[in-house]
C-alpha cells in the first residue's frame, strides 16, 4: 500500500472540503441584492392588505396568487361566502344551480366540515386574524397618532372576524398577538368566553377610533364599533345564555344619532355611487380598475327576483 498517497491526499481533501463548505456558507449569508425587495415591515402596506382582505381574494386582482390554495379563488371572498352562509339557508334567497356541490346544499341548511364554503370561510377569517396579529406585533410600542389609530382599526377588523366565527361556528380556536408562534393546535375558546373577548376589545378601542364619518371612506370608525356591539348584544342570548336587548338598542341608537338612516330608495344601495347612501356605516370598497374580485355583491334586487 502506498502510504505516501494517504499522507498527502487526505490533508489535501480536507483542505478542499473546508474551503468549499466555508464558501457555501458565505454564499448563503448575503444581503439581498434585489432593490425591489423590502425586508423591513411596511406598516401602511400591511394595513392596506388587512382592509383589502375584506374585498379581494389574493394579490393579483380578480384571480391569481390567491390567499387560499386549492380552491376556486373567486368563490373564496369574504362577502360572497358570508352571503351564501347567511342568506341561502333562509327563505330570503336561493341558488338554484344544483351543479355547485358546495353552494346548493346550503339552500337546505346542510352544513358539513367538507363543504367548500364552510371550510373556506373558516380559512378566510383566520388568514385575516393572522394578518391582524402580525400587524399588532410589528407595531407594538408605536405611539404616534396614525399608528395608534391604525392599531385600533386592526383590532376592530380582528373583532369583526371573531364575530363572524362566533356566529357561524361557535366554539373556535383562539389566537391573538400574545399567542406563541410555532406549529401547534390552538386551544378552542367557548362561545361565551369569545363573546366576552369581543365585547372587551370593542369597548377598549372605542375612544381610540375616529368619530363617526370622520375617517377615510372605507375605514372603520366609532359608528362601526357601536354597530358591531349592537349586533353582538342582539344575539347575546344565543352566545351566552343571557339576553342583552337593552344594550343592543342602546348602541343601535348611538348609530342612528350619529346621522345614519335608511336610504329613501332601497335599490340605491346597489348602485356604483352608493358611497352617497346614508346607510353606509362600514362599506367594503370595490373598484373596477384597482380593486377587482369575483366575490363582490354587484346584484340588482330588481334582476334577482324570481316571479
Give the positions of each predicted feature.
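Bacterial Sec-dependent N-terminal signal peptides
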Residues: 1-32
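Membrane-proximal, proline-rich intrinsically disordered regions
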Residues: 24-79, 270
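Conserved, well-structured interaction surfaces
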Residues: 44, 48-57, 93-169, 185, ...
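Structural recognition of the beta-strand scaffold that forms the well-ordered cores
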Residues: 136, 165, 173-175, 280-283
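TPR/Sel1-like alpha-solenoid repeat signature
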Residues: 155, 226-232
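Short coil/turn linking the two alpha-helices of tandem helical-hairpin repeats
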Residues: 166-167, 173, 235-241
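Polar, glycine-rich mid-to-C-terminal structural blocks
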Residues: 234-238, 249-307
Amino acid at each position: 500500500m502506498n502510504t505516501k498517497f494517504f499522507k498527502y491526499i487526505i490533508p489535501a481533501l480536507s483542505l478542499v472540503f473546508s474551503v468549499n463548505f466555508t464558501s457555501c456558507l458565505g454564499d448563503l449569508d448575503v444581503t439581498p441584492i434585489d432593490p425591489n425587495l423590502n425586508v423591513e415591515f411596511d406598516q401602511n402596506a400591511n394595513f392596506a392588505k388587512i382592509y383589502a382582505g375584506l374585498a379581494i381574494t389574493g394579490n393579483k386582482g380578480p384571480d391569481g396568487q390567491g390567499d387560499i390554495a386549492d380552491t376556486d379563488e373567486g368563490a373564496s371572498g369574504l362577502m360572497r361566502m358570508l352571503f351564501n352562509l347567511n342568506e341561502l339557508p333562509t327563505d330570503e334567497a336561493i341558488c338554484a344551480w344544483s351543479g355547485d356541490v358546495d353552494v346548493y346544499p346550503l339552500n337546505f341548511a346542510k352544513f358539513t366540515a367538507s363543504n367548500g364554503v364552510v371550510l373556506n370561510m373558516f380559512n378566510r377569517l383566520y388568514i385575516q386574524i393572522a394578518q391582524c396579529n402580525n400587524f399588532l406585533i410589528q407595531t407594538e410600542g408605536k405611539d404616534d397618532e396614525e399608528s395608534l389609530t391604525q392599531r385600533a382599526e386592526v383590532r376592530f377588523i380582528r373583532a369583526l372576524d371573531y364575530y363572524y366565527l362566533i356566529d357561524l361556528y361557535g366554539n373556535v380556536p383562539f389566537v391573538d398577538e400574545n399567542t406563541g408562534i410555532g406549529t401547534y393546535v390552538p386551544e378552542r375558546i367557548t362561545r361565551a368566553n369569545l363573546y366576552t373577548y369581543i365585547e372587551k376589545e370593542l369597548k377598549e378601542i372605542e375612544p381610540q377610533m375616529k368619530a363617526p364619518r370622520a375617517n377615510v371612506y372605507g375605514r372603520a370608525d366609532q359608528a362601526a364599533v357601536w354597530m358591531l356591539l349592537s349586533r353582538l348584544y342582539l344575539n347575546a342570548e344565543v352566545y351566552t345564555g343571557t339576553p342583552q336587548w337593552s344594550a343592543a338598542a342602546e348602541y343601535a341608537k348611538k348609530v342612528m344619532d350619529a346621522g345614519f338612516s335608511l336610504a329613501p330608495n332601497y335599490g340605491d344601495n346597489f348602485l356604483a355611487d352608493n358611497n352617497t347612501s346614508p346607510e353606509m356605516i362600514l362599506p367594503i370598497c370595490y373598484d373596477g380598475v384597482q380593486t377587482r374580485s369575483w366575490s363582490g355583491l354587484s346584484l340588482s334586487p330588481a334582476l334577482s327576483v324570481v316571479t
